[in-house]
Amino acid sequence: MDAPSSASGPTQPRLSPADALAALRASAPLTQCITNYVAMQIAANTLLAAGAAPAMIHTVEESGAFAGLARAVTINIGTLSPAWVDGMKAAIDGATAVGTPWVLDPVAHYASAYRSAVARDLLSRRPTILRGNASEILALAGGNTAARGVDAADPVTAAGAAASALAREYGSVVAVTGAVDLVTDGTRVAMVSGGSPWMPQVTALGCSLTCLMGAFAAVTAPLEATVAALTLFAEAGARAHAHSEGPGSFAWRFLDALAAVTPDDLTGTERVSWNAP
């Protein structure tokens, strides 16, 4: 089901997942990914399989200038150091200066005081899209969570109100990812279903999803970009699962499936429901 009418950014059209995938593959948007050590290779391969062009540029000496050239920027705090944080801030400043969309993934921001402070600082810079699991989004909005590491300890539906509050406060589209994903801009809500139960057993798939959201934000408005990325992930995950025996075979079949999914496969998909809690 296509998205209902919604406000979009000044330059990006509102596209269905099918049209967004076609636009992404037609333009191969250059996407700057400042992600963690664990995720770099799989994130780059994910973007290549989907049809985008990754660039893993993170040093402060060049990240800001490169962000001015990229069509989207993604920030993931999975493996932090002061030097990397400086590079993140420079990239955000570079993207903001030219109106380039950027995505924030506050991985396990509740795990330490330093990590929490960095996440809060980056969030205050008003990301175009904010992606996290339910525990990350709940904690970022000031709620309680039992999570301590990178994995969620709360169901997606428990973070719905927190996601809406964050979206309204920061003007961001917020995605809460899990077995069923929730996306909101503070007013509209979409749920995306599909994927595979093996996805949480393959490291860095969520981090790669953050990068893919950035790539889609280069070709369509933020809400639609987020839904398109989730829909493509869900479709590819379901296809890979059908031919896999476990998380090992799923990991490489998932990349094949990403490359094989066509815009027609996402046309009229029933994976997306709008304004569903």
Curated annotation (Swiss-Prot):
**What are the entry keywords?**
ATP-binding, Kinase, Magnesium, Metal-binding, Nucleotide-binding, Thiamine biosynthesis, Transferase
The Swiss-Prot or TrEMBL record lists the needed cofactor(s) as: Mg(2+)
Q: Name one GO biological process term.
A: thiamine diphosphate biosynthetic process
Cite a single Pfam family from the UniProt record. Answer: HK
The catalysed reaction is: 5-(2-hydroxyethyl)-4-methylthiazole + ATP = 4-methyl-5-(2-phosphooxyethyl)-thiazole + ADP + H(+)
Q: Which domain of life is it from?
A: Bacteria
Q: What positions does the entry give for ATP binding? A: 131, 177
EC nos: 2.7.1.50
Task: Give the record's family classification.
Answer: Belongs to the Thz kinase family.
Q: Under which name does UniProt file this protein?
A: Hydroxyethylthiazole kinase
Q: Which gene encodes it?
A: thiM
